UniProtKB/Swiss-Prot annotation:
PANTHER family: SULFOFRUCTOSEPHOSPHATE ALDOLASE (PTHR39340:SF1). Its EC number is 4.1.2.40. This is Tagatose 1,6-diphosphate aldolase. SUPFAM superfamilies: Aldolase (SSF51569). Pfam families: DeoC. Keywords: Lactose metabolism, Lyase. It catalyses: D-tagatofuranose 1,6-bisphosphate = D-glyceraldehyde 3-phosphate + dihydroxyacetone phosphate.
Length: 325
């Protein structure tokens, strides 16, 4: 599937001059509210959430090729971003219905690909929870849903970034060794599926195919994968798609995420960048709540800057241009 010139131009706006997507993710809503609530007794306000997103955008977008925001709380932050920083906007509702089976996808009802584009987005991003081992009844609904969004994005001639998060309803803890054993197949098979032309996905935003905390040499406890087994899972991931793909940071520490990217590269993965969120800015939340705006700004200018600068340095030697795909 060849991309239109407009889509190519839009993805270029989201990338650096080397064709690598070094994007800052701050479309968190439910997760952010929970993080903020850990440091204050009252419910986080809309004003607090919006202001924190603005602070991160003002201080860090000069070092990112693009920023991912949500249209619920992130529009002031989109206006505050650096002029050279591209914009992705999230199209999905945050979280999923824990009382219903299947983690079915849901769009923000007052938004469309057209409206996100009119808001200034260079790409539409949608998050899908997917388990290749779920029932066909569940998965056929998800496939149809993604086909719809893909068609919308084709109609609007705007890139479609699909984020896939894997799960297993029979393994409630996705950080467990039990889930680590099934994760590689789930991640790589989902990538293979959504690379099919019928979905019109332009860029995949994906998990790394292993839990690095269980890789030999990275693990402090139980080892699920030897280094060579882990490396093979990265190679299998690379072979699973012809599309550009970028890694999400999944809330791990900045140091572990950077080490993961080095391991991926050394394994032979031709990934095309990152959408890195909490690994860059999470420490600012506590400072913002407990010490205020100016202290949070100072944190972002020092620790936050170091996190994103170190990440950019790692990307220079590990990621490859999406234009090679």
């Amino acid at each position: 599937m060849t991309k239109s010139q407009q889509k190519v131009s839009s993805i270029e706006k989201l990338s650096n001059q080397e064709g690598i997507i070094s994007a800052l993710a701050f479309d968190q809503r439910g997760a952010l509210k929970r993080m903020m609530a850990e440091h204050q007794s009252e419910t986080p306000t809309v004003e607090q959430i919006e202001q924190l997103k603005v602070l991160v955008s003002e201080e860090l977008t000069q070092y990112a090729s693009s920023i991912l925001l949500d249209p619920e709380y992130g529009l002031p932050a989109s206006d505050a971003r650096n002029n050279d920083c591209g914009l992705l906007l999230a199209y999905e509702k945050t979280g999923y219905d824990v009382n219903a089976k299947g983690r079915l996808p849901d769009c923000l009802v007052e938004w469309s690909a057209k409206r996100l584009k009119e808001q200034g987005a260079n790409a539409v991003k949608f998050l899908l929870y997917y388990d290749v081992d779920d029932t066909e009844e569940i998965n056929i609904q998800k496939k149809a849903y993604i086909e719809r969004i893909g068609s919308e994005c084709v109609a609007e001639d705007i890139p479609f970034f699909l984020e896939v998060l894997t799960y297993d309803d029979n393994i409630p803890d996705n950080k467990s060794a039990e889930f680590a054993k099934v994760k590689p197949r789930k991640v790589n098979e989902a990538m293979k599926l959504f690379s099919e032309d019928c979905f019109n996905v332009d860029v995949l935003k994906v998990e790394v195919p292993v839990n690095m905390n269980f890789v030999e040499g990275f693990s402090e406890g139980e080892v699920v994968y030897t280094k060579e087994e882990a490396a093979q899972h990265f190679r299998d991931q690379d072979a699973a798609t012809h599309l550009p793909y970028i890694y999400l940071s999944a809330g791990v520490s900045a140091e572990l995420f950077q080490d993961t990217l080095k391991f991926a590269h050394d394994s032979g993965a031709q990934f095309n960048g990152v959408l890195c969120g909490r690994a860059t800015w999470s420490g600012a939340v506590k400072v913002y709540i407990e010490e205020g705006e100016q202290a949070a700004r100072e944190w972002l200018r020092t620790v936050g800057f170091k996190n994103i600068d170190d990440l950019n340095t790692v990307l220079k030697t590990t990621a490859t241009s999406w234009k090679n795909k």
